[in-house]
Amino acid sequence: MNRLIVLCLFVAMIYATIALPKKEDISNDERSISVSKVPVKKSVAIAGAVIEGAKLTFGILEKILTVLGDINRKIAIGVDNESGREWTAQNAYFFSGTSDVVLPASVPNTKAFLYNAQKDRGPVATGVVGVLAYSLSNGNTLGILFSVPYDYNLYSNWWNIKLYKGIKRADRDMYNDLYYYAHPHKGDNGWHENSLGFGLKSKGFMTSSGQTILQIRVSRA
């Protein structure tokens, strides 16, 4: 009788071992669920965004160009504010081309703004040429020229940056000044530096192709 009881208990223990799942299987399932619930961080490399100035790279600007799609005249712009002052957007003026992006309303010190523009839509022979204007908290205005032509047999890429006294909006007069008279820089795949006056300086780089990136850093002199 005792042997029969022991045998029954032994069989019951074997059955329980087979029926219950192993601890390792449960923990594996839990790890899979927890990983799937981790949110994917979205990229901040979008035109119209304000990012940390230290994170402004050619790679970010290349991503912005890619988002614009298959357009043969386009530009991605990034300008890093290390001036010690906050910038406030005035407007964007286009001599040719267009943009769907609104200039960031303000750019604090140590931040950079991202922007893009493109040729006019449709089968039209135009480039993308314009000026961006930001006023500084000291009452002066930063004008930024970008020029990507349609016909490279006649024209080249050009860019410029100038600090104007007082609050100004970008317009045809500012474009003419920056393009023709204020010593613009050629987009030649090289860095160019110059003094902006008012205790500031700039350093910028522009590529020479029709799918262009323009990166500028404004800092204290």
From Swiss-Prot:
Family of the protein in this entry: Belongs to the actinoporin family. Sea anemone subfamily.
Spans annotated as Trp-rich region, which is important for the binding to lipid membrane: 147-162
GO cellular component terms attached to this protein's record: extracellular region; nematocyst; other organism cell membrane; pore complex
Signal peptide: 1-19
Natural source organism: Urticina crassicornis (Mottled anemone)
Protein role: Pore-forming protein that forms cations-selective hydrophilic pores of around 1 nm and causes cytolysis. Pore formation is a multi-step process that involves specific recognition of membrane sphingomyelin (but neither cholesterol nor phosphatidylcholine) using aromatic rich region and adjacent phosphocholine (POC) binding site, firm binding to the membrane (mainly driven by hydrophobic interactions) accompanied by the transfer of the N-terminal region to the lipid-water interface and finally pore formation after oligomerization of monomers.
Pro-peptide positions on chain: 20-42
GO biological process, one term: pore complex assembly
Compartments in which it is found: Secreted; Nematocyst; Target cell membrane
Record-annotated site: Interacts with the lipid membrane: 202
Region N-terminal region, annotated ranges: 53-72
GO molecular function (one): channel activity
This protein's domain notes: Composed of a long N-terminal alpha-helix and a core region rich in beta-sheet structures. Before the pore formation, the alpha-helix binds the lipid membrane, partitions into the lipid-water interface and stabilizes the monomeric molecule on the membrane. Finally, it traverses the bilayer, thus forming the transmembrane pore.
Positions of region (Plays an important role in the hemolytic activity): 45-54
Keywords for this protein: Cleavage on pair of basic residues, Cytolysis, Ion transport, Membrane, Nematocyst, Secreted, Signal, Target cell membrane, Target membrane, Toxin, Transmembrane, Transport
Domain of life: Eukaryota
InterPro entries per UniProt: Actinoporin_PFT, Anemon_actinoporin-like, Cytolysin/lectin
Residue positions binding phosphocholine: 96, 129, 147, 149, 175, 179-180
Motif (Cell attachment site, crucial for protein stability): 186-188
Annotated site residues (Important in the initial contact with the lipid membrane) in this chain: 155
Full protein name: DELTA-actitoxin-Ucs1a
Pfam families assigned to the protein according to its UniProt record, in alphabetical order: Anemone_cytotox (PF06369)
